[in-house]
Swiss-Prot record:
It comes from the Bacteria. Residues 325-362 are annotated as: Disordered. Its cofactor is [4Fe-4S] cluster. This is GTP 3',8-cyclase. One of its GO terms (molecular function) is cyclic pyranopterin monophosphate synthase activity. S-adenosyl-L-methionine binds at residues 30, 75, 126, 198. Catalyzes the cyclization of GTP to (8S)-3',8-cyclo-7,8-dihydroguanosine 5'-triphosphate. The gene is moaA. It comes from Acidothermus cellulolyticus (strain ATCC 43068 / DSM 8971 / 11B).
């Protein structure tokens, strides 16, 4: 088995997240606020998007570098035409241990069965609330919440089990929904994951005061149902997991603000136009599309991809969330400023604008 390459901090490359489109049919405030991503916003033209064949070729190169888990994201990935065909192509690659999809669920009722038949193994659905009015306000959409719930049911009927449900919790917005979401997941055999509101991109108006700490979420759930912590299932797992003592499943929290996990991050993100980003909070990407579209022979293209991926990952040193946490508690007074300046996404430095989450997926 290929040993994964490691970055400058010793982190192995194991996970690849592939954005297949920058478009979405919702306008969630924490990702694509309508005042920025409105009718006049220019999305990527189709000619600039990687083809399915190009995506598969790049994915194969990442597998040669040690990647074993692939997740398709967006925007909303189900807006990409004929997505089950891409799933089938990726599922046919050797040594892919996990092939998953993250979706807002609005189109999942239509695509759950074709995706499963094509070889998709897992589905994660964004579900920030079970209140229809709160949902409409959060997602800034006319799409009914029932469409998302129907998509979750269809995925379960198609054989996806367990289904993970992601909820980004914001103070004063949906923090009152935590217990209801947990109960819904318990009652239906799903795994609920509560995510601390993150300062991703530049357009979501993030404030630290809006963050509901994972510790508070855990305390609230444990006051209703006794729980016990679970060990990580694999190195680099981002969620802290807990099981319900009554045997009715588990839930997780992703505490990227209060408990950064940069030191264990094994993920790399590929945008829909073939740019590679080594951090969710990155400022700039690395172009792979020009390699796969170069006018040269197949072996030379594969060799160039292998070299580029090794170079990009081996030079990686970003740990944005850790440095943010150090800044916030004053622990970085003696930190090397050159390190901070070199870290992608350091928004505390003038001119550094982080890539938007809708461009590279969450």
């Amino acid at each position: 088995m290929t040993q994964p390459i490691r970055d400058s901090l010793g982190r192995p490359l194991r996970d690849l997240r592939i954005s297949v489109t920058d478009r979405c049919n919702m306008r969630c405030r924490y990702c694509m606020p309508r005042e920025i991503f409105g009718p006049n916003f220019t999305f990527l033209p189709r000619s600039e998007l990687l083809t399915f064949e190009e995506i598969t070729r790049i994915a194969a190169a990442f597998i040669r570098a040690g990647v074993r888990k692939i997740r398709l994201t967006g925007g909303e990935p189900l807006l990409r035409a004929d997505l089950p065909r891409l799933v089938a192509m990726l599922a046919d690659l050797p040594d892919v241990h996990d092939l998953a999809l993250t979706t807002n669920g609005s189109l999942l009722a239509r695509y759950a069965r074709p995706l499963r038949d094509a070889g998709l193994r897992r589905v994660t659905v964004s579900l920030d609330t079970l209140n229809p009015a709160t949902f409409s306000r959060l997602a800034d959409t006319d799409i009914p919440l029932d469409n998302v719930l129907a998509g979750i049911d269809a995925a379960q009927s198609a054989g996806f089990f367990p289904i993970k449900l992601n909820a980004v919790i914001r103070r004063g917005v949906n923090d009152g929904d935590v217990e209801e979401l947990a109960a819904f997941a318990r009652d239906n055999g799903h795994i609920m994951r509560f995510i601390e509101y993150m300062d991703v991109g530049n357009s979501n108006g993030w404030r630290a005061a809006d963050v509901v700490p994972a510790a508070e979420i855990i305390a609230r759930i444990s006051s209703h149902w006794p729980i016990d912590p679970l060990p990580p299932r694999y190195p680099g797992e981002v969620a802290n997991r807990f099981r319900y003592r009554d045997g009715r499943g588990e839930f997780g929290v992703i505490a990227s603000i209060t408990q950064p996990f940069c030191r264990d991050c094994t993920r790399l993100r590929l945008s829909a136009v073939g740019e590679v980003f080594t951090c969710l909070f990155a400022v700039r990407g690395h172009d792979l599309r020009s390699i796969v579209r170069s006018n040269t022979d197949s072996a030379a293209i594969d060799a160039a991809l292998d070299e580029a991926i090794t170079r990009i990952w081996s030079r990686r040193s970003d740990r944005y969330s850790e440095l943010r946490a150090l800044d916030s508690d004053g622990s970085r007074e003696d930190a090397d400023e050159s390190e901070a300046s070199a870290v992608p996404g350091r928004s505390t430095h003038p001119g550094h604008r982080k890539v938007e989450m809708s461009y590279i997926g969450g």
